[in-house]
Amino acid sequence: MTGKAKPKKHTAKEIQAKIDAALTNRGGGKAGIADRTGKEKGGHAKYECPHCKITAPGLKTMQIHHESKHPNIIYEESKLVNLHAVLAPVAESKPKPGIRGSLKK
């Protein structure tokens, strides 16, 4: 049991983790579509495996994945799906009228 009069304090590591979690964009939802598809930064999820649909940033990484996960299937670069060419650019939508944002500024 902790003493009733003693205040509970947070460690510096815990506070830093909270600050990091609050300020870092984790890329979920519509805000992270451009980051996940790799259109803007050019490195995220460029190639897709035709067998298991897992993504990889480059051909060498995809070859390593193929050799470890699909050893009985012949590796062919021509069958890989280039997601940068397939995915259309993200369309910018205008804000809808009558929808108020957060009150927290």
Curated annotation (Swiss-Prot):
Keywords: Cytoplasm, Nucleus, Stress response. The keyword Nucleus applies. Residues 26-46 are annotated as: Disordered. Disulfide bonds: none annotated. Coiled coil: none annotated. Mainly expressed in the epidermis. One of its GO terms (cellular component) is cytoplasm. It comes from the Eukaryota. Residues 36-46 have a biased composition (Basic and acidic residues). InterPro entries: MBS1/2-like. Required for acclimation to reactive oxygen species (ROS) responses downstream of beta-cyclocitral (beta-cc) or mediated by dihydroactinidiolide, including singlet oxygen 1O(2) detoxification reactions, especially upon light-mediated photooxidative stress, and leading to programmed cell death. Prevents leaf senescence. Involved in cold acclimation. This is Protein METHYLENE BLUE SENSITIVITY 1. It comes from Arabidopsis thaliana (Mouse-ear cress). The gene is MBS1.
